[in-house]
Swiss-Prot record:
Active site: 34, 37
Location of the Thioredoxin domain: 1-110
Sites marked Deprotonates C-terminal active site Cys: 28
Disulfide bonds: 34-37
InterPro entries from the UniProt entry: Thioredoxin, Thioredoxin-like_sf, Thioredoxin_CS, Thioredoxin_domain
Keywords attached to this entry: Allergen, Disulfide bond, Redox-active center
Function: Participates in various redox reactions through the reversible oxidation of its active center dithiol to a disulfide and catalyzes dithiol-disulfide exchange reactions.
Entry superkingdom: Eukaryota
Pfam families in the cross-refs: Thioredoxin
UniProt site positions, description: Contributes to redox potential value: 35-36
Protein name (Swiss-Prot/TrEMBL): Thioredoxin Asp f 29
Family: Belongs to the thioredoxin family.
Amino acid sequence: MSHNVEKITDAKVFKEKVQEGSGPVIVDCSATWCGPCKAISPVFQRLSTSEEFKNAKFYEIDVDELSEVAAELGVRAMPTFMFFKDGQKVNEVVGANPPALEAAIKAHVA
């Protein structure tokens, strides 16, 4: 099974896929220099391929590449996982905490 995390590098694409999208969406807001981001990235990748979460869309943004998007979302620490439902932000998990991330995804796609 392939990884289902798509990297978004353009603010317009972010708006189209996340803010104007439908269904459950999870966005990993991270940075290349962030150690905890690198540590939890394989967990996020694994969760994105889970049959249990097949109806959710998984995206990643680099807060340095998309600083205007990160500012608009209010990202203050990395990693921050943002949860959207039909374009509306409904939850977030801050920090590299695999159990909290998995629990939040389960609640989000239920």
